[in-house]
Regions:
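A short, hydrophobic beta-strand-centered structural micro-motif
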Residues: 284-291, 334-360, 368
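Extended, Lys/Arg-enriched charged tracts that mediate electrostatic binding to polyanionic substrates
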Residues: 16-53
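A structural "domain/chain start" motif
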Residues: 189, 269-318, 419-428
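Gly/Ala-rich beta-loop-alpha elbow adjacent to hydrolase catalytic centers
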Residues: 155-159, 163
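Short, surface-exposed "cap/lid" segments of acyl-processing enzymes
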Residues: 47-50, 59-100
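Serine hydrolase/lipase
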Residues: 64, 93-112, 119-154, 168-285
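Short beta-strand->alpha-helix linker/helix-N-cap micro-motif
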Residues: 310-334
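C-terminal/domain-edge helix-coil "capping" segments
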Residues: 276-284, 343, 364, 374-428
């Protein structure tokens, strides 16, 4: 459960990044943790392909993890795929058989899939997944044959449907079920009930939705004859964000929250080492103070933002001491904090404040990270505020990550020992 929750957060970050692959801070963030990412585009005249291929090695499990992420709907071509709701016959173990069967009428009690999703996956297969003899090639051949390789297929909305159906096709083409997992976010059903019954158990599918997202059930509701399958994971969504219930940024927030819950559970059971508030190496020690404004402390998701920020500071700093986490606002002066930091043995003091201010008459707020760095003598080395406009309850972790990315650059200018590249690690 813990490993699944960990890779769900990675998949969610990648699903955000694939929408803007060349400027994505989510991809930059993943790269800083060792992920090698390449975006892929293609067009066969009918279907426009947009996905990303990433890989990273995890020494704790001795696995080379490959992550293939399909973009959700973002163009007219994508919506043509979505609206091609006619069902086509499903089956076959070669491209020729698949194409031939899809052209035939769906028999009574036969397995059938969404015509648009099927054409998209067919284009993916022809783009380099298989050769002219319908044998796995390249990346997918390597994954299938390498005992230390494992594949994660993922996507949001249309991307999730693509990942699901591609997973089914890979099994039909000879890839063992045990070699991969499919993780989807807000994805519609891909086939009818016969397809779900005959093929649903052929892949490991983690199907993530939420209590307010209409897309996963849209085909069943509006067109009928479609059925979901796989392991359902449903996030309980606040009614305050009903207009953003399908946003990938929302799924990212909730995946982080669920990951923290699972991490805490594993720590309480003794399966993971507790996160330390003190790490001392030969590098200078930095005392870290993180606080949120009084107006934010009552909001449940702010706890996740603080944990995310603290985790990132831990990874940036070779030597650190996490000081009082819930510092009362204005309870201490800067000089008081400096004295406490020096007494703890710190050479530097890093103060971070997390603020959220709602714009008048707007349904959005500005999530701001205020960061100040001082040496032990009180000399201010850098100070700055980094903000993002977000919904009050959606996109906060994404915004916090973007703010932290800028904040880290400011620290790098003053502290040459800041760590910007990290080894992939399942611990936290």
């Amino acid at each position: 459960a813990y490993v699944q929750s960990y890779f769900t957060t990675i998949a969610a970050a990648s699903c955000l990044g694939v929408y803007l692959p060349h400027t994505s801070q989510e991809f930059d963030y993943l790269r800083s943790y060792g992920w090698q990412i390449e975006s892929q585009q293609g067009n066969d005249g009918k279907v426009e392909l947009n996905y990303a291929v990433a890989k990273n090695y995890f020494p704790q499990i001795n696995k080379q993890i490959y992550l293939v992420t399909f973009r959700g709907s973002a163009s007219k071509s994508d919506w043509k795929i979505n609206l091609a709701t006619k069902k086509v016959n499903y089956g076959g173990s070669t491209l020729a058989e698949m194409h031939e069967l899809a052209a035939q009428p769906v028999p009574k009690d036969g397995a059938a899939v969404h015509a648009g999703f099927n054409s998209y996956v067919d284009a993916v297969l022809r783009s380099g997944v298989v050769d002219e003899n319908s044998k796995l090639r390249g990346l997918f051949k390597r994954i299938s044959e390498d005992p230390d390789a494992y594949l994660v297929l993922t996507g949001h909305s249309l991307g999730g449907a693509t990942a699901t159906l591609l997973g089914e096709r890979l099994v039909s083409l000879g890839m063992p079920k045990e070699k991969f997992v499919v993780i989807t976010f807000g994805a519609p059903a891909v086939g009818n009930s016969v397809f779900a019954e005959q093929y649903g158990n052929k892949i490991k599918l983690v199907r993530i939705s939420n209590t307010a997202d209409p897309v996963p059930g849209s085909l069943q509701t509006f067109f009928g004859g479609y059925k979901q399958f796989g392991e359902p994971v449903k996030y309980s969504l606040s009614n305050k964000i009903s207009n953003l219930q399908h946003a990938m940024a929302m799924y990212f927030d909730y995946s982080i929250s669920e990951y923290y819950k699972e991490r805490d559970k594993q720590i309480s059971m003794g399966r993971l080492e507790p996160v330390t508030d003190r790490k001392i190496t030969q590098q200078p020690v930095v005392a870290v103070w993180v606080n949120t404004s009084d107006s934010l402390k009552k909001l449940a998701y702010v706890t996740d933002i603080k944990r995310f920020v603290l985790d990132e500071y831990r990874k940036m700093l070779p030597s650190y001491i996490i000081m009082e986490r819930n510092l009362p606002k204005d309870a201490y002066t800067t000089q008081d904090l400096l004295k406490l930091s020096r007494d703890a043995g710190a050479e530097y003091m890093l103060v971070c404040g997390i603020e959220g201010n709602q714009a008048p008459k707007e349904g959005y707020w500005y999530l701001t990270l205020e960061q100040g760095l001082f040496d032990k003598n009180g000399r201010m080395l850098t100070i700055g505020a980094f903000g993002r406009k977000v919904s009050p309850a959606v996109g906060n972790i994404q915004a916090a990550g973007e703010n932290l990315w800028q904040a880290r650059e400011a620290l790098c200018e003053q502290l040459p020992f800041i760590v910007t590249q990290h080894e992939a690690h399942l611990g936290y």
